[in-house]
Amino acid sequence: MRGRDEDTGEFRGASRSQQRREALEIFDLGEKLVALTPAQLAKLPVPESLIPHIEESKRITSHIAHKRQLAFLAKHMRREDDETLAAIRDALDANSDTARREVAAIHRVERWRERLLADGDAALAELLEAYPAADRQQLRQLVRNAIHERAKNKPPRAYRELFQVLRDLSQEQGLESGDSGLEDGESALEDDE
């Protein structure tokens, strides 16, 4: 309970500032939940009682009304136990980590593509050394066509196809997970820049 402890004279419970901080954290958590797609929301351990409030918050577009609805959602979230809110936070963190890893994997594939276009055969030899299952002839032809398209200002069909081939190779060979010498290739990319 709140109030002073009769024996020691100290206050019991959280201070007002701490309560405000906790309320703002829950409000921010509610904003994150509203920003999720229905598919992402379905993967989270959100109580059924909160789903209609989240959907209503998504529906409202007026700034002040939306903020008021978020505050209403936060009020309902504060009624949930701490374990439920912690589970939602953990699941959101896991989702953001997964998304971050996926974006990083795409960036690595893009760096390989740019390096192949800039360095040509030297970068191709390094890629083939790290990933022997890659088709040398197909990669060389795609690189050549992408350079030709870029020079003639044509649509980047081969450029996109090169990305798709590298992405497929990364998924098959473990480029995304950091296996098969990715760290070597990644550091080589960073050394050249």
Swiss-Prot record:
Stretches with biased composition (Basic and acidic residues): 1-10
Protein name, as recorded: Dual-action ribosomal maturation protein DarP
Pfam name, any one: DarP
Extent of the signal sequence: none
HAMAP family reported in the protein's UniProt record: DarP
Gene Ontology molecular-function annotations: ribosome binding; rRNA binding
Compositional bias ranges of the Acidic residues kind: 181-193
Keyword Plastid: no
InterPro entries per the UniProt record, alphabetical: DarP (IPR006839), DarP_sf (IPR023153)
Location within or outside the cell: Cytoplasm
Keywords for the protein's UniProt record, in alphabetical order: Cytoplasm, Ribosome biogenesis, RNA-binding, rRNA-binding
Single GO cellular component term: cytosol
rRNA-binding recorded as keyword: yes
Functional description taken from the UniProt entry: Member of a network of 50S ribosomal subunit biogenesis factors which assembles along the 30S-50S interface, preventing incorrect 23S rRNA structures from forming. Promotes peptidyl transferase center (PTC) maturation.
GO biological process, one term: assembly of large subunit precursor of preribosome
Species of the source: Xanthomonas oryzae pv. oryzae (strain PXO99A)
Annotated segments matching region Disordered: 1-20, 171-193
SUPFAM superfamilies found in the cross-reference section: PSPTO4464-like
Similarity remark: Belongs to the DarP family.
